[in-house]
Amino acid sequence: MYPDYISAKKMKENYEGNVFSPMGCRSFLSPWKDENGNYKWEGRFNQGVVSLNLPQIGILAEGDMERFWQILDERLSICFEALMCRHKALEGTSSDVSPVHWQYGAIARLGKGEKIDKYLHGGYSTLSLGYIGLYEVTKLMTGESQTTEEGQKFALKLMRRLRTATDTWKETTGLGFGLYGTPEESLCSRFAEIDQKKFGSITDVTDKGYYTNSYHVDVREKIDAFDKFTFESQFQTISTGGCISYV
């Protein structure tokens, strides 16, 4: 087992003074209060994740920045529809499907046959927009790594665009949408393989056989651990629905 560390100081800044552990390695819930105004973290859950293939958008844009943002908006609309499909599929679910979760206290103590709907609304549970390949899409659109001045400017603009989308969805639906750095142990290779077959070998993009995890620095880049943490931290304050950094 490898250890995961959290920064209590930074968590307090990002999560309204709260410190709590993630679900799995990186999934963080948005702050939520009960009817008495008390924060609650235990017993909450995620309804589903849909992940954006950022490098593919960059490939399709062919260096045209206006076209890039247009395709991104189109893909975001599809992601929203997919997440809402997941949400609607869960509505009307009976607590009987998993008594240990819904009746015996793992998540709730509902009656037999009672619907779980109240836990799907109001931000109690989350719906996550994931993303993969910030390094590769930055390389495609700027010709540089996201660690350069120009690359960083584009990468941050893109991340903020994604965060604005989830914030807007949350405001308009009342559901707990969040931005989430996808844990891509298999998806990193799957997306890359799909694009390699469709678009061929592209230097620093499809030729590696994988895409870089979320907002992470390219694993081939020469950078020390502390500089890597410092650089990636600026993306963590945007991707508050799920984030992690590795050394």
Q: Which functions belong to the PLM regions below?
A:
Residues 1-123, 144, 148-247:
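Conserved catalytic cores of very large enzyme subunits
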Residues 127-140, 160:
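Contiguous, well-ordered alpha-helical segments that form the cores/surfaces of helical PPI scaffolds
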